[in-house]
Each structure stands twice: as C-alpha cells, then as structure tokens.
Regions:
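His/Asp/Glu-enriched short active-site or ligand-binding loop at hydrolase and phosphoryl-transfer sites
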Residues: 60-72
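Active-site environment of divalent metal-dependent phosphoester hydrolases
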Residues: 16, 41-45, 70-73, 99-103
Length: 135
C-alpha cells in the first residue's frame, strides 16, 4: 500500500481460522504487514470477536473495518463484532470500501463523526488516518 510494507488482504467470507492464519503468516514471512480488509464479513471472525482479537494479537495482522459497518451494521452479529473490537482498541483502520458515488459512496466523514462520539477522539482520528494520511 502506497510504497510501504502494508498489504491489503481480502479473504473469502467462509474462510477457516487455519487458512486465514496461514495466509497472514505467509505474507508476514515475506516481509509484509497484512491489513485484513473488512473482517466483519468473515463468518469465523464475526462469530467469535474474542478469537478475532486473539488472531490479531498472535499474527500481527491489522484489522480494517468498513465505514458502512461502523455506521449501520447489517445485523446483530456485525454490531456485536464491531462494538467489541472498537471497545478493545483492536481496530487499526476504518475505510470506505467505496466503489461508486451512488451504491457505495465515500462516507468517511460520517464514520469519523460517529467514532468521535462513541470512542475516544484520538482513537477516532487514528482510525481514519493510516500512516498519517486519510484512508
């Protein structure tokens, strides 16, 4: 990402813990720092927020949630997952996942405002900037 050792990693929705660990380890051994894109979509992760935290701590993978999920989780499980990780300080970045201006618009400002209300202001700023730049 941007000439750094960070690499955005998107996995399958039904990926197993072992396969996710193997992918992260392979990238780490190659000298990269994996940033796991929207872990709130991966069934194994969303079913066990505590295990996701353990996964993050053990593998060194960073977690990037979608701004849409922060603003309006699609279901109880996404809400529980997102709130738990934010409370634990285990989210490393928030990104828009914008594909166009109509169906998936950039909503980082709204996500940032939500984060400043529901988390620490410094943490909110850290989440919407990555390497000193707005995500």
């Amino acid at each position: 990402m941007g000439g750094t050792d960070y690499v955005l990693l998107e996995l399958w929705r039904n990926i197993s813990w072992q396969t996710a660990q193997d992918a992260v380890k392979q990238l780490t051994r190659a000298g990269y720092c994996p940033v796991l894109a929207h872990p709130e979509r991966y069934l194994a992760f969303i079913r066990s927020p505590k295990k996701t935290l353990q996964f993050r701590n053990e593998t060194g993978a960073l977690l990037q949630l979608n701004a849409d999920t922060v603003l309006s989780p699609r279901n109880y499980w996404e809400r529980r997952f997102t709130e738990y990780l934010l409370k634990e300080g285990a989210v490393d970045a928030i990104a828009s996942d914008a594909h166009d201006c109509i169906n998936r618009p950039v909503n980082m400002e709204a996500a940032y405002q939500w984060l400043t209300i529901h988390t620490d202001a410094a943490y909110a700023k850290e989440l919407v900037t990555f390497g000193g730049e707005l995500t």
